[in-house]
From Swiss-Prot:
Reactions catalysed according to its record: prephenate + S-adenosyl-L-methionine = carboxy-S-adenosyl-L-methionine + 3-phenylpyruvate + H2O
Name of the featured protein: Carboxy-S-adenosyl-L-methionine synthase
Record has Transferase as a keyword: yes
GO terms, biological process: tRNA wobble uridine modification
Subunit comment: Homodimer.
Species this protein is from: Pseudomonas putida (strain W619)
Database matches in CDD domains: AdoMet_MTases
Lineage: Bacteria, Pseudomonadati, Pseudomonadota, Gammaproteobacteria, Pseudomonadales
Record-listed S-adenosyl-L-methionine binding positions: 40, 65-67, 90-91, 122-123, 137, 204
InterPro entries: CmoA, Methyltransf_25, SAM-dependent_MTases_sf
């Protein structure tokens, strides 16, 4: 399972298609996200640390939009509550297949890991079990804005008292100066990680109709409307942030 460098947009394309999580993306995804999302490794590792505080015995821990299972692996490394199991969900068959391979490899390297179930499913239609932790790591931004509140409301209903939703998202900013500055700094981050101007421009064209970021205020108000009592931002690097939402 070699990790390939992300060169998906390195050559000029006559027409840039919308971004999809297909086999081509799966092959380069670890390199792509490390070079595109500032703070990603810190978020992933600490998601497991945070989850360990909120996880309760004999409950489900969800990784919604699991991609290759990085968050699931972090949950399994850090959570020690008896009887917990991780349910990793993604709607990309290519992602699910590779995720299962990575988790099998993790099983061979570590002992006493939480059991895990990997589902190829649409989280908008997924019936949730009682859960103490739900992680959504850069997933909500790919869901149609008009469907986000209903999903968060169902997650809130599934969360047990004392549990938590950990939500990581790219942010948009209402203040134009702030938005422009952080956007330019994010582009500088990509350049510093070896992406060319062509790659940056074509990736932007591919993803702009697929990913719709919200402001922190919108996230907070929506989470409250979904029934969460407290929203605590715990991490931000440039225009990427992670929140803890408490029931």
């Amino acid at each position: 399972m070699s990790k390939q460098p992300d060169r998906l947009f390195a050559q000029p394309l006559e027409q840039v298609p919308d971004f999809v999580f297909n086999e081509d993306v799966v092959r380069v995804f670890p390199d792509m996200i490390k070079r595109s999302v500032p703070g990603y490794p810190t978020i992933v590792e600490n998601l497991g640390v945070l989850a360990a505080r909120f996880a309760q015995p004999n409950t489900a821990l969800y990784d919604l939009g699991a991609s290759l299972g990085a968050v699931t692996q972090s949950l399994r490394r850090h959570v020690r509550s008896e009887g917990c199991r991780v349910i990793a969900v993604d709607n990309s068959a290519a992602m699910v297949e590779r995720c299962r391979q990575y988790l099998t490899a993790q099983d061979s390297m570590f002992q006493e890991l939480l059991p895990v179930q990997v589902l190829d499913a649409d989280i908008l239609a997924l019936p949730f079990e009682p859960a103490s932790v739900v992680a959504m790591n850069f997933t909500l931004q790919f869901i149609a804005p008009e469907q986000r509140l209903a999903l968060l409301s169902r997650i809130r209903q599934a969360l047990l008292p004392g549990g938590a939703l950990i939500l990581s998202e790219k942010l948009h900013f209402a203040d134009d100066q702030e938005q422009n500055l952080l956007n330019e700094l994010h582009l500088d981050f990509k350049r510093a990680n070896g992406y060319s101007e062509l790659e940056i421009a074509q990736k932007r064209s591919a993803i702009e109709n697929v990913m719709k970021p919200d402001t922190l205020h919108t996230h907070t108000e929506r989470l409250r409307a979904a029934g969460f009592s407290k929203v605590v931002p715990w991490f931000q690097c440039l225009n990427f942030a992670s929140l803890i939402a408490l029931p």
